[in-house]
Swiss-Prot record:
Keywords: Oxidoreductase, Pyridoxal phosphate. The modification N6-(pyridoxal phosphate)lysine is found at K704. It is an enzyme of class 1 (oxidoreductase). NCBIfam families: gcvP. GO terms for biological process: glycine decarboxylation via glycine cleavage system. It comes from Agrobacterium fabrum (strain C58 / ATCC 33970) (Agrobacterium tumefaciens (strain C58)). Its cofactor is pyridoxal 5'-phosphate. This is Glycine dehydrogenase (decarboxylating). It comes from the Bacteria. The glycine cleavage system is composed of four proteins: P, T, L and H. It catalyses: N(6)-[(R)-lipoyl]-L-lysyl-[glycine-cleavage complex H protein] + glycine + H(+) = N(6)-[(R)-S(8)-aminomethyldihydrolipoyl]-L-lysyl-[glycine-cleavage complex H protein] + CO2. The lineage of its organism: Bacteria, Pseudomonadati, Pseudomonadota, Alphaproteobacteria, Hyphomicrobiales. Belongs to the GcvP family. GO terms for cellular component: cytosol; glycine cleavage complex.
Length: 954
């Protein structure tokens, strides 16, 4: 008889520690993997991989790791320090109701939030359709021809609009006009963007201060930040007469009732879709939009979803006109944008699908009527309301009573907007209740009931909308929640995300987004805080941001962090601006040269161009390392004007370079600063710190290293860390410190997703984060070893190791049997995998990054699939398979292939069920291989007519 083990309570350890869940391989599996790699211990592998010259001297420690429950309790305690009042502050941020069917089935659904940017369109058809709906909705409401699939926020979109105006204008002027009625954060970002490019920004009343001859473009706010609704038709016509371009920042909800920018003649419309069901979240994330006239579509920044056909001629969606983007055109790109806000754009599009045009118009009418009722009550109290006609925002002159009324409103549970020294503004919205109006009246000294007033309209009659919008059937088919739920499910079933399989994209770090980390983002204490509330109402946010910043400083060796950049590309831009402003403050106005290796990610040169720097490329050696001799030569050659260098570490080739310290020393010797791209930080956390190596500034991709999900192409966060001498030059914001240099609309970027990264740090602890880095390196080296022999691993260190990712060479297959890297990628779809990163940083190769979250079983399944693909290529090489009609060339295979007529020289079994593919719950690509050329030559970027859907169903 077995004696039970004696249990002592002091031995008890909770089982819900995150590192037990987050790290994929078990200790026994790690031992097996280490044996394959050739090391007896994980530490021995790390010692052989990470150069001792850069190793972190002090372990990463900041207290014990918390369990999931303890971390959630800590988050709840912190969230409760935020005060959730009703905010009528407006200024581009409004209360909205997220339909529960959208919250549960999209925002909280890993099938949507764990997907990657849809570069592989065959396995992204659901998301692409949702984004096409978004583009269609935006085009209809703005009255323009083509819309993109989102930008980062409204203010950033305005800055992008200015840059686009300059690109396409026939005018040779160097100034840009900004309507003084634009939101303050919009004006601030435009000024930030214009300064390094040498453009003058003129701010004023467009009806009295704008001379079209003086500008290459202008932007107008519609309605204005203080409520004015103006007709810009005449001004736009005058701008066109001088070759200038007109942009309008428009409220989508208002456009259901008001004449569209397109009908006024605008070339560009921008704005935010936040009030279409996306919580304010202390400033973000939200999806901005941009729409343009057809003539300007190739100059528009951001992703653009278009319609094409697959190999069977069936309709299929894809990203169109990608040659405009930074990964192709580099410093000549339209923008440095990499991804934007796909998840939030999907939510906004579904808001439109669910409510339809009648529902959205009804919400707009109710919002306007609330504003009119508010105005009537204040007028009864003797106050004068500005403007006379408005949509949702009014401004009240209160004189010396401003402070008293604002405080009284807060006591009533309402935040109002301080306007100048003597006025108060308020913006009504979908969530405004009758009790809120009565509370505001009390704050002004009145004691009215909403029943005391009759609603009416105060919209300008000559600007009432008469044109139709959202007429496509998709906006009329899903009013019943049962149908809406099924529609969302049908779309998600067409996509491949982390909830189905590993996504081994190199330089993308598709790691686990733990459910416990995601839970707090929908708590009202985080999601319902306006970004411009008084500081004492956001003490929980301050505590979280301060602690996360401190932890990131500990991880990186930097002295200060700014959370403002709301993407990695925006982080690069902010970091380079910080360097530029540092040089300007120290007399270095001439320092404008940026050294960038030719292997760098396309955002690097694109970002450098945006801050007015001249990009000087540096050679890369055959082994993938920066050519130190060429770097030294260029640094000496441009020493007088050297501003900085931009490097990635580990390198973009997936190797820890031994010369990184020397590169930093050379740069500093010649007066430059070092920008170290933090995209590969998942290989460094706990092992090496950029600030110790010699770097001056980095951005971190919190949506990579620190677990914020990619959302199918956003949201992201790209906070920047700097050494102490650069800290005074970090981005400011007009609503907080009043300093210049804002790079995002909100002071802290997209803070409502920061609980994800903070809880990840709390639950992993310093020791857990370090272990995660080590396992990420183990997993990458294990894959390199397993694929060795079948494929060449292009870049390794002197010890034969890779960092957290590896590049395998598929070019020999193209030479031996005509199999391209695209064929390999599409065949992986048949196996149930998203392809690794294709043709970057080396054309014709695959960059593989498994992350620490993947189990040995999943990694082995991927390796088995890759090895099977090599054997299929060998069949072609040795004549056992037709060179043009084989599983690789015909991939991906669909259900239609399986059940249709089969005229191929290989079996259905071989085509549809390759090694690595699950049989019972296999993922089937919804379309065959998509024709990219057709899609660009026959560009359609709005929903096809209903007949196309009917034809597809036949």
């Amino acid at each position: 008889m077995t004696t039970p083990t004696e249990f002592h309570f002091t031995d008890y350890q909770p089982y819900d520690f995150a590192n037990r869940r987050h790290i994929g391989p078990s200790p026994s599996e790690m031992a097996e993997m280490l044996k394959v790699v050739g090391y007896k211990s994980l530490d021995a592998l790390i010692d052989a991989t990470v150069p001792s010259s850069i190793r972190q001297k002090v372990p990463l420690t900041w207290g014990a790791a918390l369990t999931e429950r303890e971390a959630l309790d800590r988050l709840r305690e912190t969230a409760n320090k935020n005060q959730v009042l009703t905010s009528l502050i407006g200024q581009g941020y409004y209360g909205t109701i997220t339909p529960p069917v959208i919250q549960r089935n999209i925002l909280e659904n890993p099938a949507w939030y764990t997907a990657y940017t849809p570069y592989q369109p065959e396995i992204s058809q659901g998301r692409l359709e949702a984004l096409l709906n978004y583009q269609t909705m935006v085009c209809d409401l703005t009255g323009l021809d083509v819309a993109n699939a989102s930008l980062l926020d409204e203010a950033t979109a305005a800055a992008e609009a200015m840059a686009m105006c300059q690109r396409v204008a026939k005018s040779k002027a160097t100034a840009f006009f900004v309507d003084a009625n634009c939101h303050p954060q919009t004006i601030a970002l435009i000024e930030t963007r214009a300064a390094p490019l040498g453009w003058k920004v003129i701010i004023g009343n467009p009806f009295t201060d704008l001379d079209p001859v003086d500008v290459f473009g202008a932007i107008f706010q519609y309605p204005g930040t203080h409520g004015h609704v103006s007709d810009f038709t005449g001004l736009i016509s005058r701008l066109h007469q001088t070759g200038a371009i007109a942009a309008v920042a428009a409220d989508l909800l208002a456009l259901t009732l008001l004449k569209s920018p397109g009908e006024m003649g605008a070339d560009i419309a921008i704005g935010t879709s936040q009030r279409f069901g996306v919580p304010v979240g202390y400033g973000g994330p939200h999806a901005a939009y941009m729409s343009v006239k057809d003539a300007h579509k190739r100059s528009m920044p951001g992703r653009l979803v278009g319609v094409s056909v697959d190999a069977r001629g069936n309709r299929a969606y894809r990203l169109s006109l990608q040659t405009r983007e930074q990964h192709i055109r580099r410093e000549k790109a339209t923008s440095n944008i990499c991804t934007a806000q796909v998840l939030l754009a999907v939510m906004a599009s579904m808001y439109g699908v669910f409510h339809g045009p009648q529902g959205i118009k009804a919400i707009a009418q109710q919002t306007h009527q609330k504003a009119v009722l508010m105005a009537k009550g204040l007028e009864k109290l003797g106050y004068t309301i500005e403007p006379e006609t408005f949509f949702d925002t009014i401004t009240v002159e209160v004189g010396h009573m401003q402070g008293v009324i604002l405080r009284s409103a807060v006591a009533e549970g309402v935040n109002l907007r301080k306007v100048g020294a003597t006025k108060i503004g308020m913006s009504l919205d979908e969530r405004t209740r009758p009790a809120t109006l009565e509370a505001v009246w009390r704050a002004f000294g009145g004691n009215f009931s909403i029943s005391d007033f009759e609603p009416d309209y105060r919209l300008p009659k000559d600007l009432l909308r008469t044109s139709q919008y959202m007429t496509h059937p998709i906006f009329h088919m899903n009013r019943a929640e049962s149908e809406m739920t099924r529609y969302i499910r049908r779309l998600s079933d067409r996509d491949l995300a982390l909830d189905r399989s590993m996504i081994p994209l190199g330089s993308c770090t598709m790691k686990l987004n733990a459910t416990a980390e995601m839970l707090p983002i929908t708590w009202p204490e985080f999601s319902d805080i306006h970004p411009f509330v008084p500081a004492n109402q956001a003490l929980g946010y301050k505590e979280m941001i301060d602690d996360l910043s401190e932890k990131l400083c500990s991880v990186t060796g930097y002295d200060a962090f700014s959370m403002q950049p709301n993407s990695g590309a925006q982080g690069e831009y902010a970091g380079l601006l910080t360097i530029r402003n540092y040089h300007l403050a120290n007399g270095g106005t001439h320092r404008d040269v940026c050294l960038i290796p030719t292997s760098a990610h396309g955002t690097n040169p694109a970002s450098a161009q945006m801050v007015g720097m001249k990009v000087v490329p540096v050679k890369v050696r055959d082994n993938g390392d920066i050519d130190i001799d060429d770097f030294r030569l260029k640094a000496e050659q441009y020493a007088e004007n050297l501003s900085c260098c931009m490097i990635t570490y580990p390198s973009t080739h997936g190797v820890f370079e031994e010369t990184v310290r020397e590169i930093c020393e050379i740069t500093h010797k010649h007066g430059g600063q070092v920008y170290l791209d933090g995209a590969n930080m998942n290989a460094m956390v706990g092992l090496a710190r950029p600030g110790d190596i010699g770097s001056d500034v980095s951005h971190l991709n919190l949506h990579k290293t620190f677990c914020i999900p990619h959302g199918g192409g956003g949201p992201g966060m790209g906070p920047i860390g700097v050494k102490a001498h650069l800290a005074p030059f970090l981005p400011g914001h007009p609503t907080t410190d009043g300093r210049e240099g804002a790079v995002s609309a909100a002071p802290f970027g997209s803070p409502s997703i920061l609980p994800i990264s903070w809880s990840y740090c709390l639950m992993m602890g310093g020791e857990g984060l370090t272990q995660a880095t080590k396992v990420a390196i183990l997993n990458a080296n294990y894959i390199a070893e397993r694929l060795k022999g079948a494929y060449d691993v292009l870049y390794k260190s002197e010890t034969g190791r890779v960092a957290h990712e590896c590049i395998i060479d598929t070019r020999p297959l193209a030479d031996s049997c005509g199999v391209t890297v695209d064929d390999v990628a599409k065949r992986l779809i048949d196996c149930g995998f998203h392809a690794p990163t294709m043709s970057w940083p080396v054309a014709g190769t695959l960059m593989i990054e498994p992350t620490e979250s993947e189990t040995k079983a999943e990694i082995d399944r991927f390796c088995d699939a890759m090895l099977a693909i090599r054997e299929e290529a060998r069949d072609i090489e040795e004549g056992r398979a037709d060179k043009n009609n084989n599983p690789l060339k015909n991939a991906p295979h669909t259900v239609e292939d399986l059940v249709g007529e089969w005229d191929r020289p290989y079996s259905r079994e071989k085509g549809c069920f390759p090694p690595g593919a699950f049989r019972i719950d296999k993922y089937w690509s919804p379309v065959n291989r998509i024709d990219n050329v057709y899609g660009d030559r026959n560009l359609i970027c709005t929903c096809p007519p209903m007949e196309a859907y009917a034809e597809a169903a036949e």
